[in-house]
From Swiss-Prot:
The lineage of its organism: Bacteria, Pseudomonadati, Pseudomonadota, Gammaproteobacteria, Thiotrichales. Binds the 23S rRNA. It comes from Francisella tularensis subsp. holarctica (strain LVS). Its cofactor is Zn(2+). Binds 1 zinc ion per subunit. NCBIfam families: L31, PRK00019.1, PRK00528.1. This is Large ribosomal subunit protein bL31. The keyword Chloroplast does not apply. GO terms for cellular component: ribonucleoprotein complex; ribosome.
Amino acid sequence: MRQEIHPKYTEVTVTCSCGNTFVTRSTAGKKEMNIDICSECHPFYTGKQRIVDTAGRVDKFKKRFGGMKKYN
């Protein structure tokens, strides 16, 4: 393999918005990384159904279409 063509692979501390912190390796070039959701709080891994809305999309949808009548 040719030397010095690959990015550096360093340890990164990842912090989730739920408070979970773990260390992994990455080529991102940062020592710390913040994420919105991880395996500790994601509904698929926890088995709990909840709405994950980080940008207010659900509230925006309900505001826009919440007053509509249901048609059968």
